């Protein structure tokens, strides 16, 4: 019953990366890297705090979670879980100035997984606002290994930024599996916590990139993370990464963000 509720629609702009996960039955058979580019995220939040609509738009395709059209969106401490009527899933979080998440579009036996970050406005020069800052938040993703079923993941995220020098350390902790259909906790995946140091990238002052790694079973998986700073006073950060083990058999696609 939505009687008496008001609705607020927000628009976020950002970037994404993607990977195809090819399935054999319920198990992962192979991976192939796909496109990256611009992301547009549209969301509608009800006055009771629930999210009724989220649309992720990219040149590679759109995915819509609309509770008025057969989808479900459930909120939990770290963000929201979306499921379409054909069971494509999403894990995402919307902060005041930024949003981040992962979502999938399934065609036949292939699930294209997207991870991305977006916001309402970028901080043009964070160092002019604050020389250093600490951020805390969450990470949301999907962990896959050839021969096994995919596992959706959540974690705690932290970042320590030195905007004056243009560096930022990032890490996750308490990585755990989660069922999108039930919200149940699936246990610890702490070996898939990530860490790394990012540096200011390109001609702007609000984009940071660098390598992040985890050390599952003493066999490191790594990838490039991209993070951006959002808000009029550098209130939040959001980023994403796709990590792959050297032999190509394990992959962790995740997004992350935090506020100060």
Task: Go through the PLM ranges and name each one.
Residues 1-260:
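Mature soluble binding/inhibitory domains
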């Amino acid at each position: 019953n939505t009687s008496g509720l008001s609705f607020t629609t927000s628009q976020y702009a950002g970037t994404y990366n993607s990977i195809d996960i090819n399935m054999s039955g319920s198990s992962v058979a192979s991976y192939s890297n796909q496109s990256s580019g611009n992301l547009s995220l549209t969301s509608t939040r009800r006055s009771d705090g629930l999210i009724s609509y989220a649309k992720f738009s990219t040149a590679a395709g759109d995915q819509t979670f609309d509770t008025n059209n057969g989808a479900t969106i459930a909120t939990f401490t770290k963000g929201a879980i979306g499921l379409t009527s054909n069971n494509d899933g999403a894990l995402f979080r919307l902060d005041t100035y930024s949003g981040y998440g992962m979502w999938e579009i399934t065609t036949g036996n292939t699930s294209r997984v997207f991870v991305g970050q977006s916001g309402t406005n970028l901080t043009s020069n964070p160092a002019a606002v604050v020389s250093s800052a600490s951020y805390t938040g969450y990470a949301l993703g999907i962990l896959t290994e050839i021969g096994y079923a995919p596992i959706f993941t959540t974690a705690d995220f932290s970042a320590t930024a030195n905007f004056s020098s243009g560096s930022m350390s990032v890490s996750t902790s308490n990585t755990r599996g989660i069922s999108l259909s039930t919200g149940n906790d699936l246990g610890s995946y702490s070996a898939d916590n990530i860490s790394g140091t990012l540096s200011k990238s390109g001609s702007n002052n609000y984009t940071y990139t660098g390598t992040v790694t985890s050390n599952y079973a003493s066999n490191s998986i790594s990838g490039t993370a991209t993070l951006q700073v959002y808000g009029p006073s550098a209130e939040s950060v959001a980023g994403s990464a796709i990590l792959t083990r050297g032999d190509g058999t394990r992959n962790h696609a995740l997004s992350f963000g935090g506020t100060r």
